[in-house]
Amino acid sequence: MPRHHAGGEEGGAAGLWVKSGAAAAAAGGGRLGSGMKDVESGRGRVLLNSAAARGDGLLLLGTRAATLGGGGGGLRESRRGKQGARMSLLGKPLSYTSSQSCRRNVKYRRVQNYLYNVLERPRGWAFIYHAFVFLLVFGCLILSVFSTIPEHTKLASSCLLILEFVMIVVFGLEFIIRIWSAGCCCRYRGWQGRLRFARKPFCVIDTIVLIASIAVVSAKTQGNIFATSALRSLRFLQILRMVRMDRRGGTWKLLGSVVYAHSKELITAWYIGFLVLIFSSFLVYLVEKDANKEFSTYADALWWGTITLTTIGYGDKTPLTWLGRLLSAGFALLGISFFALPAGILGSGFALKVQEQHRQKHFEKRRNPAANLIQCVWRSYAADEKSVSIATWKPHLKALHTCSPTKKEQGEASSSQKLSFKERVRMASPRGQSIKSRQASVGDRRSPSTDITAEGSPTKVQKSWSFNDRTRFRPSLRLKSSQPKPVIDADTALGTDDVYDEKGCQCDVSVEDLTPPLKTVIRAIRIMKFHVAKRKFKETLRPYDVKDVIEQYSAGHLDMLCRIKSLQTRVDQILGKGQITSDKKSREKITAEHETTDDLSMLGRVVKVEKQVQSIESKLDCLLDIYQQVLRKGSASALALASFQIPPFECEQTSDYQSPVDSKDLSGSAQNSGCLSRSTSANISRGLQFILTPNEFSAQTFYALSPTMHSQATQVPISQSDGSAVAATNTIANQINTAPKPAAPTTLQIPPPLPAIKHLPRPETLHPNPAGLQESISDVTTCLVASKENVQVAQSNLTKDRSMRKSFDMGGETLLSVCPMVPKDLGKSLSVQNLIRSTEELNIQLSGSESSGSRGSQDFYPKWRESKLFITDEEVGPEETETDTFDAAPQPAREAAFASDSLRTGRSRSSQSICKAGESTDALSLPHVKLK
């Protein structure tokens, strides 16, 4: 778009950008009027604005007559001629001619398109004209044939001359109309486009036929005798009129498509047939050239071969010798089959192509129903209650339109009589009365300056509608009315002819005028239309032939297989894949993959739950066996261990499937297996660890004191206010019932006390008693016996224990280590049920060094470190005693309170104590023991 910043004295051209403030000052206060086209409506309505008063830049849409200041009248006159002009999206008029020329251009283009379709794309009655032209051409051909017969030469020549005159006129007019009507196509517009159209093959044929006809007629009329030879040659050119019958070239396109589709088969047949022709002709020529003069040359043999193999058989040349006849018969049988192949290939190709075209036409019939169905679906969707579409209701607002106020002023009484019953009812409604009142009040809302200047100028400007609150800020909810915006000066305004539509619609009708019941009715109608369109579309989907049925069946079968496969994939994702492989290696690989990757399917989860349930069942069975065997011991052991409370087993969270038999203590089992230690850490529970070894009741078991106990023990500072606890080994029972041996050692742990108990005395350190150890050589195992002594006895024992610990530290003596040893031939390890052994079957050995003790235990029981027995205290009341925790492996101790009662070891059956004779011992009473 050209842009030019004009001053006050310059004349504005079409499409100029002008600064209205400066232009108004230079022109003596004249104001610019800007016409803005309603692009969406496509009509000649102009919206006026008063931007000139604000000093904004305006786009002038006038012609050269549009000027500044005093040229406002020229602008008005030019804009009056622009009433019907269409505007582009950039605000530029699409047509610069008057409305009459626009209408003429529309008619011109319409006629041009119509004639082009009649001549190039005939439909309906247009075939009548083409049939007439065909009869003319065919009649001309017949007369040309009769003109060569001597008996009919005179009559045929005279009729042919008249017919050729008619043909020249018809073909000449048709050729000119074809060239002119081709301008409706974009590629054929202009003189270059016309030349491009004239170079088409059929236009070239028309030109040749027209020139030949003119030459023949001119030669006949002049009676030139020397032009007879030329006329005979031009007659052939007139035969080309038959070629132009198929203007669109559908026949040639069909033939070309068939030949192209079967080109390989045709080339193969023609190639083999040509080889047979060459060989047969040459062999017959060699045999017949001496005996038969008809085959004197190879060309004569080729002629004979062609006529014979094409099954024509003129009979002008025939072989005479028997050898030549045998060769011709053999090659005829072979060659005729290949020469006949192209005819069959082309015939089948034409049949298939015709059938395909029929199917294509059948499928093309589905386009309109499919488009109608899509349209109905969209309209039904857009009319939904939750839809925010505005445009979908606009087609239904036409029924609410009323005539413009201008037409009502011309004759309201006469127009009311011509109104239909529906319009009278609508106008009688409250909505119609409000529309009437708004239309009547248009003149009252006009500005005074407009009324004053309306008398002196031919134009008349109105103010815009004063919309109500509903549609004032919602212009998209109302129809685009043709009301202009107010302009202060009437000199730059446009006439009322630009203000109103061609239809004169002047009503303010919005989407909100459609009441909910009306919208509901519209939705119902659209739903019914949708169902009707769907039914019609289904009717067009009926199969055309058996091939379509097979294709539909195969497509449906393929879709079903895809859906089944998708369903199976989803089921496998939910339930897991239950693959059963015959190969062992592949099965192992699959199991390894399942172990490495977490299977989140339902099958994997079920398997995981089953494994965990089996592990829990095995653990519970083991614990129940232990509990039963402990209760079956003697009276003393029963009294001592009957108070053990075995709660339900609590599975470790770090391992999902490992049983207590397979669990390993990775923290320190490799170095500290079979050793007693005093743990003093404040974060981990305290406990006494007993290491159970695989043994039999008849075999001798040796317990060795490991020196690692001394190095791993941790001293606890003891204050005077704290209590003390003494742990010593003691034998419990001499008699034990025989019980089955467990497969692996078991870990038994007593949980620590609650941290809520704070002010309790601390225990004493663990010290061995050599005398007690000698007396307890024949004991089965060790247990804890709680003694109720006073504070003085506990303090005296604490002092002695301190001195003994110092002596152990100085001399490097070992602490007590309970390391059972049995021969290696035992296949199973003993459980807790073998904790109590008879004194006659067990011997305790004291190892002098750490290496000997640990080496002996490792030699006899290399796998013993995998299982341990932990006994810890559970909750105790404020008046009950609490036990310290002793571990064979180094474990940190939790902060806990200890009871004032001390613990010491003793024998339950013999009631003999390893400690001092004056100390009073009680039976083992551990009311809160928990397996963990």
From Swiss-Prot:
Intramembrane features from the record: 299-319
Tissue: Strongly expressed in brain and skeletal muscle. In brain, expressed in cerebral cortex, occipital pole, frontal lobe and temporal lobe. Lower levels in hippocampus and putamen. Low to undetectable levels in medulla, cerebellum and thalamus.
Biased composition range(s): Polar residues: 431-440, 902-914
Reaction(s) catalysed by this chain's protein: K(+)(in) = K(+)(out)
Matching InterPro entries: Ion_trans_dom (IPR005821), K_chnl_volt-dep_KCNQ (IPR003937), K_chnl_volt-dep_KCNQ_C (IPR013821)
Biased composition (Acidic residues): 876-885
Domain of life, source organism: Eukaryota
Keyword field contains S-adenosyl-L-methionine: no
Molecular function, one GO term: voltage-gated monoatomic ion channel activity involved in regulation of presynaptic membrane potential
Extracellular compartment spans: 147-156, 222-229, 288-298, 320-325
TM region positions: 126-146, 157-177, 201-221, 230-252, 267-287, 326-346
Region ranges (Interaction with CALM): 370-378, 521-528
Compositional bias per record (Low complexity), positions renumbered to this chain: 888-899
Pfam families found in the cross-reference section: Ion_trans (PF00520), KCNQ_channel (PF03520)
Subcellular location: Cell membrane
Regulation: Phosphatidylinositol-4,5-bisphosphate (PIP2) is essential to activate KCNQ5 channel by inducing the coupling of the voltage-sensing domain (VSD) and the pore-forming domain (PD). Calcium suppresses KCNQ5 channel current through calcium-bound CALM C-terminus. Therefore CALM acts as calcium sensor that controls channel activity. Activated by niflumic acid and the anticonvulsant retigabine. Inhibited by barium, linopirdine, XE991 and tetraethylammonium (as homomer). Insensitive to tetraethylammonium in KCNQ3-KCNQ5 heteromers.
Phosphoserine modified-residue sites: S88, S447, S831
Binding residues for a 1,2-diacyl-sn-glycero-3-phospho-(1D-myo-inositol-4,5-bisphosphate): R248, K264, K361
BP-aspect Gene Ontology terms: potassium ion transmembrane transport
Gene Ontology CC entries for this record: calyx of Held; clathrin coat; plasma membrane; presynaptic membrane; voltage-gated potassium channel complex
UniProt-annotated stretches for the region Disordered: 404-465, 655-678, 876-919
Positions in the Cytoplasmic compartment: 1-125, 178-200, 253-266, 347-932
Disease as annotated in the protein's UniProt record: Intellectual developmental disorder, autosomal dominant 46: A disorder characterized by significantly below average general intellectual functioning associated with impairments in adaptive behavior and manifested during the developmental period. MRD46 patients manifest developmental delay and mild to moderate intellectual disability.
Similarity comment: family membership: Belongs to the potassium channel family. KQT (TC 1.A.1.15) subfamily. Kv7.5/KCNQ5 sub-subfamily.
Entry's free-text remark on domains: Each channel subunit contains six transmembrane segments (S1-S6) with S1-S4 forming one voltage sensing domain (VSD) and S5-S6 contributing to form one quarter of an interlocking pore-forming domain (PD). The CALM binding domains correspond to the first two membrane-proximal helical regions that interact with a single calmodulin/CALM molecule forming a clamp-like structure and are essential for channel trafficking and electrophysiological activity. CALM N-terminus binds to the second helix in both calcium-free and calcium-bound forms and regulates channel trafficking. CALM C-terminus binds to the first helice in calcium-free form; this interaction is disrupted by calcium binding which regulates channel electrophysiological activity.
Protein name: Potassium voltage-gated channel subfamily KQT member 5
Organism: Homo sapiens (Human)
Gene name of the record: KCNQ5
